[in-house]
Amino acid sequence: MAAMTVQLDIVSAESSIFSGRVASLQVTGSEGELGIMHGHAPLLSYIKPGMARIVKQDGNEEVFYLSGGLLEVQPSSVSVLADVVMRAKDIDEQAALEAKRRAEAHMATAGADFNYDAAMVELAKAMAQLRVVETIKKNIAR
């Protein structure tokens, strides 16, 4: 019996990052963790900055960092639209650590005109990238 799969397209503002048949997709939506498989009910959701984990048709996994965006689930396809998408292997861990430190420093020395929401978004993105890196390290260690 053939594996039940769904067409997945992951697109950034710059280019198409992934297009193919997948057994599953795991992302963090606005209301929590989402697991999408063949036959999932139609859905439209915001995606929080974080990890997208796919299990390809052949059973191999691939992990991406998403800066946030939109998820659309239709009966025959799933689309992920994000401003920034990075393959986990392409994330610069040191740059993410530095971005986290900068955001924390800005928040600690904030004045009256400080944009706290923007700093929180930058901090969330940096921390999400670091979580993706840690996940990859754990998988390699197994």
Curated annotation (Swiss-Prot):
Record InterPro entries: ATP_F1_dsu/esu_C_sf, ATP_synth_F1_dsu/esu, ATP_synth_F1_dsu/esu_N, ATP_synth_F1_esu_C, ATPsynth_dsu/esu_N
Described function: Produces ATP from ADP in the presence of a proton gradient across the membrane.
UniProt record similarity statement: Belongs to the ATPase epsilon chain family.
Keyword Nuclease: no
Species whose genome carries this gene: Shewanella oneidensis (strain ATCC 700550 / JCM 31522 / CIP 106686 / LMG 19005 / NCIMB 14063 / MR-1)
Protein's UniProt keywords contain Translocase: no
Keyword terms of this UniProt record: ATP synthesis, Cell inner membrane, Cell membrane, CF(1), Hydrogen ion transport, Ion transport, Membrane, Transport
Name under which the protein is recorded: ATP synthase epsilon chain
PANTHER family: ATP SYNTHASE DELTA/EPSILON CHAIN, ATP SYNTHASE EPSILON CHAIN, CHLOROPLASTIC
Subunit structure: F-type ATPases have 2 components, CF(1) - the catalytic core - and CF(0) - the membrane proton channel. CF(1) has five subunits: alpha(3), beta(3), gamma(1), delta(1), epsilon(1). CF(0) has three main subunits: a, b and c.
Compartments, as annotated in UniProt: Cell inner membrane
Superkingdom per UniProt: Bacteria
Pfam families noted in UniProt: ATP-synt_DE, ATP-synt_DE_N
Membrane disposition: Peripheral membrane protein
GO terms of biological process kind: proton motive force-driven ATP synthesis
One Gene Ontology CC term in the entry: proton-transporting ATP synthase complex
A molecular function (GO) term: proton-transporting ATP synthase activity, rotational mechanism
CDD domains from the UniProt entry: F1-ATPase_delta (cd12152)
